Amino acid sequence: MKNILIVTGGSGGHVVPSTSLFEHLKNKFSVKMVSDLRGSKYINTEKFKYELIDVPNLFLKPYLLPINIFKYFLNIFQSIRFLKNNKTNIVISTGGYMTFPFCLAAFILQKKVFLFEPNSVLGRSNRFALKFSTKIICYDENLRNFPIKYNSKKVIVKPILKKEIYNLEKNIINLKKEIKKILIIGGSQGASFFDENITELIIEISKKRNFEVIQQISNINNLSSIKNKYDKSNINYKFIEFTNDSHELYNGIDLAITRGGASTLSELSFLNIPFISIPLPSARDNHQFYNSEFYYK
């Protein structure tokens, strides 16, 4: 049995797809997963075992660059030792700065490196590792920032979703349904924009028809204010926090308002739930915009 290591971390956009991949591989391979501290909060520890790694972001604090460069090289040697000790045959990177030391270590040890890119824009770490990778798995055939000379490495697949999603019934659009249910989720990084602007939009729409709102609150300090506004407008609402178990939110949803994360959009699309995507403006390489454009097409 092949030993596979999935390397992930950072935002939920990197981590959530890696857990879906883990689920699909674990019955045929021996699979391990490593993540950094930031990414670990998006991993359901009851379902997935993982090891914590500490990889510095080289450019986050420029004044620490010399120290971080030393730590980064140290990470490469630690990654080599980790792969040797675990007899790893294949490394799969889901992107993020913390994945590159393991990819480079695998290359040094002549192990296979597979890249997994769920976004419609090739991320920087995967871009750096592309040269010595075996294949890159992606959803979008027109992956942006992708060098043409590596086209032979590209493998296009349908979105890899959590197994729970496949067990849900697909949404049947019912225009005659009296009370619609709207899901508002700002993604793993939250969205203060949603707390303020989308809340006002919901209040305005509520003047014309009744509906139920399930809303992720990005900033707990906004909870009381939003609650008071909804109470005054007689809106039926439920507040939620970000959850790794997104499948629990989709039942009976008629419309979703969301950021442009690849995992969320692929789940909504699969379940035939109409959605309005508002991409995160600060997303690197504007990838959330292109994710949204991919599903718009």
Regions found by a protein language model. Give the residues of each.
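An amphipathic, basic-hydrophobic alpha-helix
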Residues: K61-I90, I108
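Active-site-proximal region of nucleotide-activated glycan assembly enzymes
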Residues: R38, I108-E169
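A short, glycine/small-residue-rich beta-strand->loop->alpha-helix junction that serves as a flexible
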Residues: I6-T19, S192
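Short hydrophobic beta-strand element within catalytic cores of glycosyltransferases
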Residues: T258, P274-D285
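Conserved nucleotide-sugar phosphate-binding/catalytic loop shared by glycosyltransferases and other
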Residues: I6-G9, K28-K71, V157
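An aromatic- and histidine-rich active-site surface loop
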Residues: G39-K41, I90-L109
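Acidic donor-binding loop of glycosyltransferase active sites
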Residues: T88-N89, N251-S266, I273-P274
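Donor-nucleotide binding loops and adjacent catalytic segments primarily
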Residues: T19, H24, V34, S40-E46, ...
